[in-house]
């Protein structure tokens, strides 16, 4: 089972997390930019702001803790280009050699 962190919890990040979950065989974590953003998605299990109408199953973890990146085998970056540099700076301490980084920005 692959451990995948989707970096960015907007419409695109949420859609990718759902798609990877539906394919099966992956442990998915959706990494939001703030605890408030994570809570807004985690409590209703839906990204009401950016992707309403799509239920997030309980198997998809939702967090704002950058340390989740350290446990991932694959990190999928879907943050808007204007926020990419500061976001990567925040997760850099948690990146490990051998991790696969995918840019879907």
Set out the residue ranges of the language-model regions.
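NAD(P)+-binding Rossmann beta1-loop-alpha1 motif at the extreme N-terminus of oxidoreductases
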Residues: 1-51, 61-64, 90
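Rossmann-like NAD(P)(H) cofactor-binding subdomain of soluble oxidoreductases
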Residues: 56, 62, 67-70, 74-105
């Amino acid at each position: 089972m692959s451990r995948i962190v989707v970096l960015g919890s907007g419409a695109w990040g949420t859609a990718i997390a759902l798609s990877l979950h539906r394919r099966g065989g992956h442990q998915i974590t959706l990494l939001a930019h703030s605890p408030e953003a994570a809570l807004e998605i985690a409590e209703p299990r839906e990204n009401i702001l950016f992707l309403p109408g799509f239920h997030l199953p309980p198997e998809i973890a939702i967090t704002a803790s950058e340390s989740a990146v350290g446990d991932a085998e694959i990190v999928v970056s879907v943050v808007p280009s204007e926020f990419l540099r500061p976001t990567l700076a925040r997760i850099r301490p948690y990146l490990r050699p051998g991790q696969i980084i995918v840019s879907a920005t």
